[in-house]
Amino acid sequence: MCIRDSIPTTLPKGSTTMGKITFERSIEDVAGEVAQFTGFSQAMTYSFESPKVFDKLKLAEDSEYRKAVVISNPLGEDFSIMRTIPVNGMLSSLSTNFNRRNKNVKLYELAKVYIASDDKNELPDERVMFTLGAFGEVDFFSMKGVVEEFLERIGMKNKPEYDPAAGISFLHPGRQADIIYDGTKIGYIGELHPDVADNYALGERTYLVVIDLATVTGMASFDRKFNGIAKFPAVTRDISMVMPKSVLVGNVEKIIEKLGYEVKKIEDVK
């Protein structure tokens, strides 16, 4: 038996936990900041899509993107699956703007895709994708610049490589590339295929970038290192080289970096 008078008198107490943003959310925040800083506006599209999207994007019949999660009680066929690729919503938004006679449109989206598991009892793999889409006063290289700015902001200091043999059906065959960082594919970039552009009623050259933030998160770091001031003044030298058009600039940079030199600026003089 416990007597009330034997319970000691104390003041109420409790502990608080300081809230913080997760590392993954920090990466997303940086992606949004970089996109907005470079002139992109945020788009928000549905995660529900129609199976007709796959044909609209010219995806192969055996494409992994066709293995979608089917909704058991959809609102209709147009909302009957969960998206496996983020570009349909982006292209639909760009198409709406183009049809409203907006001549210079740059959009970005941070949204999940849902990759179905082979085991139907398991939940799908949800991956956040950073998607950029634009037409008008934009080209392949300006989109490439946004990619590199984002990677640098999240501590990925090495320059990404661009593999032109991407083989993405909805991008222009000669104007697309996988984005490779330290040997790992983190996304892709390119100009929209003309046939797909017609499917979305886009009459301008349209450019897309898709970066898998789930992959990028494992490589990113917000740690900063500072180097001491050099004892001696820097020495710079301008070097000009004449090369065939078939030589990729990235390969030239690799050779220079292997020799221990830092490339400050490369210009294409014709």
Q: What do the predicted segments below correspond to?
A:
Residues 77, 97, 117, 195-197:
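Short beta-strands and strand-coil junctions in structured, solvent-facing domains, enriched
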Residues 22, 26-33, 38-39, 43, ...:
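Generic recognition of stable, solvent-exposed alpha-helical segments in well-folded globular domains
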Residues 48, 114, 216:
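Hydrophobic pocket-lining residues within nucleotide cofactor-binding pockets
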Residues 4-103, 268-270:
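Extended, well-folded interaction surfaces typified by the phenylalanyl-tRNA synthetase beta subunit core
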Residues 37-41, 92-96, 100, 116, ...:
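Short, well-ordered loop/turn and helix-capping segments at boundaries between secondary-structure elements
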Residues 72-74, 103, 107-137:
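Polyanion/phosphate-binding surface patch
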Residues 4-9, 16, 119-120, 125-126, ...:
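A carboxyl-terminal module marker
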